Swiss-Prot record:
Pathway: Porphyrin-containing compound metabolism; protoporphyrin-IX biosynthesis; coproporphyrinogen-III from 5-aminolevulinate: step 2/4. Its cofactor is dipyrromethane. Its EC number is 2.5.1.61. Belongs to the HMBS family. The porphobilinogen subunits are added to the dipyrromethane group. PANTHER family: PORPHOBILINOGEN DEAMINASE. The modification S-(dipyrrolylmethanemethyl)cysteine is found at C234. Binds 1 dipyrromethane group covalently. InterPro entries: HemC, Porphobilin_deaminase_cofac_BS, Porphobilin_deaminase_N, Porphobilinogen_deaminase_C, Porphobilinogen_deaminase_C_sf. Keywords: Porphyrin biosynthesis, Transferase. It holds the Pfam family Porphobil_deam. This is Porphobilinogen deaminase. It comes from Corynebacterium glutamicum (strain R). The gene is hemC. Monomer.
Amino acid sequence: MTLKIGTRGSKLATTQAGTIRDQLKYFGRDAELHIVTTPGDVNMSPVERIGVGVFTQALRDVLHAGECDVAVHSMKDLPTAADPRFHLVVPTRADSREALIARDGLTLAELPEGAKVGTSAPRRISQLKAIRPDLEILPLRGNIDTRMGKVTSGELDAVMLAYAGLTRVGMQDRATEVFDADIIMPAPAQGALAIECRADDTETVRALNMLMHADTFVSAVAERTVLNRLEAGCTAPVAAHATLDGYSGDTMTLTAGVYALDGSDQLVFSAEGDGARPEELGELVAQQLIDAGAANLLGDRS
């Protein structure tokens, strides 16, 4: 049986899903893409206005209805609460860092005063304003080509995108600066894909399990536990970044931050823990943020 892989129709989404299709074929399972239009692809309002899960719910509905066998999501877009209807697999993560695409090859520090920078993500807005309060931050939606086209056309001086997305579509050379997590921290699970099938589809569960990457899975779980514990959605100004000890992978370091949208304040905490117990580490760092007053920064975005 040929597996139908549900995916959004953008260039990035189909490239991501195509990678999963090719991996399944490598392991002997024939697969093809099944394009699904989601409300988030039609409504160009800022994501925080449309609602959490806008990109994932339509795919999950199609999957649950049996119209496809597999759904491919960007893991950072998934609601943090587990859905027992589905089996989740997380393949190897791409580079999780944030990237700037600016005119004339400029870096963030080199952008002129009052430069226009496009992004709609509160997490990016708040961190950009903390570094460069003079910048004019403008809302930005659309696919990668549309976003970068606003720089090419001169409408914007720069845009902020996930470096993973640029890399997946072969446009990483367009980045004029890539930020380490201690400069601009990425979203929880940024760069990771979430692959779902119906939990009772045992044959497809077995096929997808061959794609699981344990280090990516536990890192994403730790990061998303922070989001869940803070009761914050994927559009909240919350960032997290987990790393595993390069030698043994036994020790995980998790850093997470909560930011005031105007860039005036931030809370950032780190802790080390057992890499095999990512939820506990996520709970620990989240509690540090809560005790320090994270709710005051999140406000009604929690």
